[in-house]
């Protein structure tokens, strides 16, 4: 099956052409970072307008790069949620119009599900597995039993890990988005220079909390204003990143121990972080865990990942009707009830 996949949940306008949910023929991403940088974060209304301006061009580029035409497309997969309502609607409206015009089926898929399943674009792995989905808007641990079958093990009680990175970067005067900059600065710093707290690390649940860690960084900066410059900045970034990674790795290890499943997927934008990738690899080696982390391009928002669950649902006649609407909030473990066979 040849799928056109569309992603517009936040500030990337993306389209991809993927065969059989595994073979990427093209994967085009138009970023809005430069547009939102001056505001220090994503402005939803501006994001929606930029999606409207860009989406047709991005789709055309994806088709050209794949060497196919619209009439070759067998179905369309589109991000239905979670995400920004206006941004989602741009992608969904475009997908519905194209599917109707072409007479092909459409599948609305979950953005977080797509992050978790993106690994299948690079290799096949067996179910079940434990998944850590970690991004700017989500930090969750899931038990993944099969495509469409997910159980939430734990989640953030406040800030997501990626959100904490961006907020701390802002405290340090770093430009948006700051997570990648903290990662680069941390590489030259001492992760043991400052002992920041590890929230909920000894808690028996699999939940996360990062707002207190962010506040600890703020308090440290107020007492040590020089820490935002030079070598001290590298040490602060390394120490903050180490605290976040320690919590993520510890909770993942606990989930592996509790479920008895020694197969782990780490997915989402924060999975690009070099410190997290390194510490997860150490955990895997120490505990004999089969670890899977997609390449950075497939960790960040893209449309190729949307095609993975999209292909599964369309191939199994689990379709979305033309009344498909945006789901800004869409818990992953409720996904089965959102999909109707043969509709």
From Swiss-Prot:
Keyword Acyltransferase belongs to the record: yes
EC number(s) per entry: 2.3.1.234
One BP annotation, GO: tRNA threonylcarbamoyladenosine modification
One MF annotation (Gene Ontology) recorded for this entry: iron ion binding
Keyword annotations from UniProtKB, A to Z: Acyltransferase, Cytoplasm, Iron, Metal-binding, Transferase, tRNA processing
Function summary: Required for the formation of a threonylcarbamoyl group on adenosine at position 37 (t(6)A37) in tRNAs that read codons beginning with adenine. Is involved in the transfer of the threonylcarbamoyl moiety of threonylcarbamoyl-AMP (TC-AMP) to the N6 group of A37, together with TsaE and TsaB. TsaD likely plays a direct catalytic role in this reaction.
Protein name as catalogued: tRNA N6-adenosine threonylcarbamoyltransferase
Protein species of origin: Geotalea uraniireducens (strain Rf4) (Geobacter uraniireducens)
Record lineage: Bacteria, Pseudomonadati, Thermodesulfobacteriota, Desulfuromonadia, Geobacterales
Recorded name of the encoding gene: tsaD
């Amino acid at each position: 099956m040849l799928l056109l996949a569309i992603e517009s949940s936040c500030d990337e306008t993306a389209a991809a052409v993927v065969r059989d949910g595994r073979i990427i023929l093209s994967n085009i991403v138009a970023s809005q970072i430069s547009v939102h940088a001056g505001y220090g974060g994503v402005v939803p209304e501006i994001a929606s307008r930029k999606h409207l301006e860009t989406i047709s061009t991005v789709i055309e580029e994806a088709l050209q790069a794949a060497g196919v035409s619209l009439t070759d497309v067998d179905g369309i997969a589109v991000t239905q949620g979670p995400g920004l309502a206006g941004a989602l609607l741009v992608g969904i409206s475009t997908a519905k119009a194209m599917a109707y015009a072409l007479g092909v089926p459409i599948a609305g898929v979950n953005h977080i599900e797509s992050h978790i399943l993106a690994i299948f674009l690079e290799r096949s792995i067996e179910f079940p597995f434990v998944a850590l989905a970690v991004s700017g808007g989500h930090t969750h641990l899931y038990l993944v039993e099969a495509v469409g079958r997910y159980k939430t093990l734990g989640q953030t009680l406040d800030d997501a890990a990626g959100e904490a990175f961006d907020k701390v970067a802002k405290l340090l005067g770093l430009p948006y988005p700051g997570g990648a900059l903290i990662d680069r600065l941390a590489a030259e710093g001492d992760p043991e220079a400052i002992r920041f707290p590890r929230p909920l690390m000894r808690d028996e649940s699999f939940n996360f909390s990062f707002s207190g860690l962010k506040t600890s960084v703020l308090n440290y900066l107020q007492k040590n204003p020089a820490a935002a410059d030079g070598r001290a900045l590298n040490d602060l970034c390394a120490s903050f990143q180490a605290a976040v990674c320690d919590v993520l790795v510890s909770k993942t290890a606990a989930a592996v121990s509790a479920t008895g499943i020694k197969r782990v997927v780490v997915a989402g934008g924060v999975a690009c972080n070099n410190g997290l990738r390194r510490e997860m690899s150490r955990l895997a080696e120490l505990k004999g865990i089969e670890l899977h982390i997609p390449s950075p391009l497939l960790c960040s928002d893209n449309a190729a990942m949307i095609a993975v669950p999209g292909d599964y649902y369309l191939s199994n006649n689990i379709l979305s009707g033309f009344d498909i609407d945006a789901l800004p909030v869409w818990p992953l473990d409720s996904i089965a009830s959102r999909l109707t066979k043969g509709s």
